[in-house]
Amino acid sequence: AFAGILADADCAAAVKACEAADSFSYKAFFAKCGLSGKSADDIKKAFVFIDQDKSGFIEEDELKLFLQVFKAGARALTDAETKAFLKAGDSDGDGAIGVEEWVALVKA
């Protein structure tokens, strides 16, 4: 997963920890999968995997399917989880998370 940035086992454990609807916490998830401890460069590399349409931004529909990027077959985030995740990361209020906003969110 993630081109060697994160261990598959760590990603699977992070996804498993938020299997229940409305149990997703981005801070807990980033810590459990190991992303929050990575360098800004590695965090930017992870951004590319999540930005599925390659727009340079992570939009709401990409956040909804966020867990599936870490582990195939994972659940979609609920609308409430997705909106809270977007609100936490979208510091300039443009409705999407840019790469610098992403680094700040992961390191928060």
UniProtKB/Swiss-Prot annotation:
Q: Residues where N-acetylalanine occurs? A: 1
UniProt keywords, alphabetically: Acetylation, Calcium, Disulfide bond, Metal-binding, Muscle protein, Repeat
List, for all copies, the residue spans of the domain called EF-hand.
Answer: 38-73, 77-108
Q: Name the PROSITE patterns on file.
A: EF_HAND_1, EF_HAND_2
What terms describe the molecular function in GO for this protein? calcium ion binding
What SMART domains does the record point to? EFh
Q: Which GO terms describe its cellular component?
A: cytoplasm
Q: Where does Ca(2+) 2 bind?
A: 90, 92, 94, 96, 101
> InterPro entries per the record?
EF-hand-dom_pair (IPR011992), EF_Hand_1_Ca_BS (IPR018247), EF_hand_dom (IPR002048), Parvalbumin (IPR008080)
> PANTHER family of this UniProt entry?
PARVALBUMIN, PARVALBUMIN ALPHA
> Other remarks on record?
This parvalbumin has an isoelectric point of 4.50.
Name the chain's protein.
Parvalbumin beta
Naturally occurring in which organism (per UniProt): Merlangius merlangus (Whiting)
Q: Taxonomy-wise, where does this protein's organism fall, top ranks first?
A: Eukaryota, Metazoa, Chordata, Craniata, Vertebrata
